Amino acid sequence: MKRTFQPSVLKRNRSHGFRARMATKNGRQVLARRRAKGRTRLTLSSK
């Protein structure tokens, strides 16, 4: 049986990246929460 997780950096960044988060109001809320919590990496794309 084929595995369900077929990694793609492009798809990953388009759905979970910084610019994807900034594009919507809720995404910006996610970033604000992570900033408030003190996360060193806000999104997976900011390494």
From Swiss-Prot:
One of its GO terms (molecular function) is structural constituent of ribosome. Residues 28-47 are annotated as: Disordered. Residues 31-40 have a biased composition (Basic residues). It holds the Pfam family Ribosomal_L34. Keywords: Ribonucleoprotein, Ribosomal protein. It comes from the Bacteria. PANTHER family: LARGE RIBOSOMAL SUBUNIT PROTEIN BL34M (PTHR14503:SF4), MITOCHONDRIAL RIBOSOMAL PROTEIN 34 FAMILY MEMBER (PTHR14503). HAMAP family: Ribosomal_bL34. Belongs to the bacterial ribosomal protein bL34 family. This is Large ribosomal subunit protein bL34. It comes from Sodalis glossinidius (strain morsitans).
